[in-house]
C-alpha cells in the first residue's frame, strides 16, 4: 500500500529516502502513525476561497485558494505556456505556489522543465527546491490519520471512498511531484544515494497511482457525485497510462525484475488510458495528448521499431495547431510529424518557424537545431549540418560529447578544402570527446560511451590517428535515421551512392586492424539503403556478410546483433514472421556487453510486441 497521508513522509527538509531510514529505527507504536493505507478519517477541510487575484496577492495574505480556483488557474497557466508565455505562466502560479496544490504543481513543473532543458546546475538546484516546496504544499492537503485509525487500517483496507475530494486530488498532485523530483535527483549527482532516493520516489509515486486507480473504480461503481471527478479521473489516466506505457517499453529481462518488486506495464492498456484521458475535458487532457504525441513522434523511433502511428499523431495535434498556431511545443511536434512522413522540406520550414516565434526559452531552439542538423545529414548537406552541430556545441549543455563527436563526424564527410575553410581540426575535435562525457544517475550515457569508443581511433597508443568511415551515417543509423530516410526514395538512392563510394575506397586501401570492422559497417549501411529501396535479396547478402564476419571483428561487436535486427525486419517484410521472430530472439539472447545493447533490446522488445500479437498501437 502506498504511503498516503503521513506527515512523517515529508518533513520540511527531508525526502523519501531519509524518511525510509528513519522508519527503520522507529518503534511499532510510531509505525502505526505512518498510515500505510487509505483509511477513514473524519477531518474535512474548510473550503478555500480565492480572496484576491493570484497575480496581485498581497505579501503575507492569509487568503486561501479553493480546489476550483486552483484547477482553473493551473489550466490557464498551461494555456499561457503553450502560447510561449512562459514567464506569464510562472508569475500566475508563483503567488499561490505554497498555498494551493495545483499552483504548486504547475509552478514547480515549469521550473523543473526549464532545468531539464538547460542542464545548468543552478537551474537543477532551483528545480529541486521548487519541487520540494511543492511536495510540502501537497502534503498539507493529504489525509491525516490518528494512531487508532492507522492501526485499524492494518487490519482492513478501510473505506477508500471516504477520502475527501480535495484529499484525492492531493494524492495525484503529490505523485506527479514525486516523479519529477525523482527525475531531477537522477541528473543532480552521480552518487548511489541519489540513485536509490530517485528509485524510491518513483516506486512511491507508482503505488499512489495504483491506489488512486482503486479509488476511481470505487467512485465509478458507487456512482458517487463529485464536483471535479473528471479532473481526478484525468490525473489517474495520465499517471497510470504513462507508467504502463513507459514500463512496457523496457527490455524483457528488466520487466521481469521490476515485476518482482511490484511494477507492471501494459502498452495497450497504457495507450488506452492515455487516449481516454485525452478525450476528456480535464486540465490534464492536453498532457495526455502530448504524452501520446511524444510516444509516436520520438519514443517509437528511438526506442522502438520506427513504425509510427502518424495518423493518430496528426489527429491529436490538429486541435492544438488550431488553438496555438504559434506555440513552440506544438510547432515542434508538427515538424516532427512532417519529418516522419518524409516531408523533410516542410519539416525544415516548420522547425525554423518554431525558432522564430519566441526568444524567451532558447532551449526550444536547441531542440530545433538538433532536428535541423539531422535533416541536413539525411540530405547530405554537410555544411548546413555542420552549422547546426556547431550551434549545439556552443549553446547547449545537454550532451557536449555527442555534439562534438557529431560535429567532427559531419566535417569528416566533407572534402579537405571545405574543412579547412571552417578552420576546424577534425582530429582535435574527436580527441576532445572523451573529456566531455557526463554521468547521470551514476551511469554514462550510452550514446556518449559509443561516441567515446569510436573517437578513440583518433588517439591510438601509437600516436598515429586512424580514420573513421562515414561516422555521420553511422550515428544516423544509431539514431534510427534510416527509418525516416526510407520514406524518400531520392534520399535513399543518394545515400546508397555515398555508401558505395566508401565501399570502393575501402577495397583500394591497405589492410589494417580496422579493415574488417569498417567493411562490416559499410555492409550494414548499404543493406539498410537497399532495404529501403525494396531490393531485399541484395540487402540480405549485405546483412549475411556482417553476420558471417562475426569472429573477425575486433572493435565494433555491436554490428552483428544490430544487423540481425535489420535482417529480422527484412524477413518480416517478406511475410516470414516466424523466421523474423527467431532472428530477433537470437539477437536478444546470444549477444551481450556490446555498445548500445540497451537501445537494441528496447527495439527488440517493441518489435516482438508488435509481431507476436495484433495491436492497435
Curated annotation (Swiss-Prot):
Entry comment describing in which tissues the protein is expressed: High expression in lung and spleen. Low lower expression in liver and small intestine. Weak expression in heart, brain, kidney, adipose, and adrenal gland.
SUPFAM superfamilies (UniProt xref): TPR-like
Keyword match Cell membrane: no
Signal peptide (UniProt feature, chain positions): none
GO biological process: cholesterol homeostasis; lipid metabolic process; negative regulation of cholesterol storage; regulation of cholesterol efflux; regulation of cholesterol metabolic process
TPR repeat start-end pairs: 328-361, 520-553, 561-594
InterPro entries (alphabetical): Iml2/TPR_39, TPR-like_helical_dom_sf, TPR_rpt
Phenotype of null mutants: Chow-fed deficient mice display increased HDL-cholesterol level, accompanied by increased ABCA1 and MYLIP expression, increased oxysterols receptors LXR (NR1H3 and NR1H2) protein level without change in NR1H2/3 mRNA levels. Many NR1H2/3 targets are up-regulated, including ABCG5/8, SCD1, ELOVL5, INSIG2 and LPCAT3. Deficiency of TTC39B reduced processing of SREBP1 a pivotal regulator of lipogenesis.
Keyword Lipid metabolism applies: yes
Keywords linked to the UniProt accession: Lipid metabolism, Repeat, TPR repeat, Ubl conjugation pathway
Family: Belongs to the TTC39 family.
Free-text function comment from the UniProt entry: Regulates high density lipoprotein (HDL) cholesterol metabolism by promoting the ubiquitination and degradation of the oxysterols receptors LXR (NR1H2 and NR1H3).
Protein name: Tetratricopeptide repeat protein 39B
Organism: Mus musculus
Amino acid at each position: 500500500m502506498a504511503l498516503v497521508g503521513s506527515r512523517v513522509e515529508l518533513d520540511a527538509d527531508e525526502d523519501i529516502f531519509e524518511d525510509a531510514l528513519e522508519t527503520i529505527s522507529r518503534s511499532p507504536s510510531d509505525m502505526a502513525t505512518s498510515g500505510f493505507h487509505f483509511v477513514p478519517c473524519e477531518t474535512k477541510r474548510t473550503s478555500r476561497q480565492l480572496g484576491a487575484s493570484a497575480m496581485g496577492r498581497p505579501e503575507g495574505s492569509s487568503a486561501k485558494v479553493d480546489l476550483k480556483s486552483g484547477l482553473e488557474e493551473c489550466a490557464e497557466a498551461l494555456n499561457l505556456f503553450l502560447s510561449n508565455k512562459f514567464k506569464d505562466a510562472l508569475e500566475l502560479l508563483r503567488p499561490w505556489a505554497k498555498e494551493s496544490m495545483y499552483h504548486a504543481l504547475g509552478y514547480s513543473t515549469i521550473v523543473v522543465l526549464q532545468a531539464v532543458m538547460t542542464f545548468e546546475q543552478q537551474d537543477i538546484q532551483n528545480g529541486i527546491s521548487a519541487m520540494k516546496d511543492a511536495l510540502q504544499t501537497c502534503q498539507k492537503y493529504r489525509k491525516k490519520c490518528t494512531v487508532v485509525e492507522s492501526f485499524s487500517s492494518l487490519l482492513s483496507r478501510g473505506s477508500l471512498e471516504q477520502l475527501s475530494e480535495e484529499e484525492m486530488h492531493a494524492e495525484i498532485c503529490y505523485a506527479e511531484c514525486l516523479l519529477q523530483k525523482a527525475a531531477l535527483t537522477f541528473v543532480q549527482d552521480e552518487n548511489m544515494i541519489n540513485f536509490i532516493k530517485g528509485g524510491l520516489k518513483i516506486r512511491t509515486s507508482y503505488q499512489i497511482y495504483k491506489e488512486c486507480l482503486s479509488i476511481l473504480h470505487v467512485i465509478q461503481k458507487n456512482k458517487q457525485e463529485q464536483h471535479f471527478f473528471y479532473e481526478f479521473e484525468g490525473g489517474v489516466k495520465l499517471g497510470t497510462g504513462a507508467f504502463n506505457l513507459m514500463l512496457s517499453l523496457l527490455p524483457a529481462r528488466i520487466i521481469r525484475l521490476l515485476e518482482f518488486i511490484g511494477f507492471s506495464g501494459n502498452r495497450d492498456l497504457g495507450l488506452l488510458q492515455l487516449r481516454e484521458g485525452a478525450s476528456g475535458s480535464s486540465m490534464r487532457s492536453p498532457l495526455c495528448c502530448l504524452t501520446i504525441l511524444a510516444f509516436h513522434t520520438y519514443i517509437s523511433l528511438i526506442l522502438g521499431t520506427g513504425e509510427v502511428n502518424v495518423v493518430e499523431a496528426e489527429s491529436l495535434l490538429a486541435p492544438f495547431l488550431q488553438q496555438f498556431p504559434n506555440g513552440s511545443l506544438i510547432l515542434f511536434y508538427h515538424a516532427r510529424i512532417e519529418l516522419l512522413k518524409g516531408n523533410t522540406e516542410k519539416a525544415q520550414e516548420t522547425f525554423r518557424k518554431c525558432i522564430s516565434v519566441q526568444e524567451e526559452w532558447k532551449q526550444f531552439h536547441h531542440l530545433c537545431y538538433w532536428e535541423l542538423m539531422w535533416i541536413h545529414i539525411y540530405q547530405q548537406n554537410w555544411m548546413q549540418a555542420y552549422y547546426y552541430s556547431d550551434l549545439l556545441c556552443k549553446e547547449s549543455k545537454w550532451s557536449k560529447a555527442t555534439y562534438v563527436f557529431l560535429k567532427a563526424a559531419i566535417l569528416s564527410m566533407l572534402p579537405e578544402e571545405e574543412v579547412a575553410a571552417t578552420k576546424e581540426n577534425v582530429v582535435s575535435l574527436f580527441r576532445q570527446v572523451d573529456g566531455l562525457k557526463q554521468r547521470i544517475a551514476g551511469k554514462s550515457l550510452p550514446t556518449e560511451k559509443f561516441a567515446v569508443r569510436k573517437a578513440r581511433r583518433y588517439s591510438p597508443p601509437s600516436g598515429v590517428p586512424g580514420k573513421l568511415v562515414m561516422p555521420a551515417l553511422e550515428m544516423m543509423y544509431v539514431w534510427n535515421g534510416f527509418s525516416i530516410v526510407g520514406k524518400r526514395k531520392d534520399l535513399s538512392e543518394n545515400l546508397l551512392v555515398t555508401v558505395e563510394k566508401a565501399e570502393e575506397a575501402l577495397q583500394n586501401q591497405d589492410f589494417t586492424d580496422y579493415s574488417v570492422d569498417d567493411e562490416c559497417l559499410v555492409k550494414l549501411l548499404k543493406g539498410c539503403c537497399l532495404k529501403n529501396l525494396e531490393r531485399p535479396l541484395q540487402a540480405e547478402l549485405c546483412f549475411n556478410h556482417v553476420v558471417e564476419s562475426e569472429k573477425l571483428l575486433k572493435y565494433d561487436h555491436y554490428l552483428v546483433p544490430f544487423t540481425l535486427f535489420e535482417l529480422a525486419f527484412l524477413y518480416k517484410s517478406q511475410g516470414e514472421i516466424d523466421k523474423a521472430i527467431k532472428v530477433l530472439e537470437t539477437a536478444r539472447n546470444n549477444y551481450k556487453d556490446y555498445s548500445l545493447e540497451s537501445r537494441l533490446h528496447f527495439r527488440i522488445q517493441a518489435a516482438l510486441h508488435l509481431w507476436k500479437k495484433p495491436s492497435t498501437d
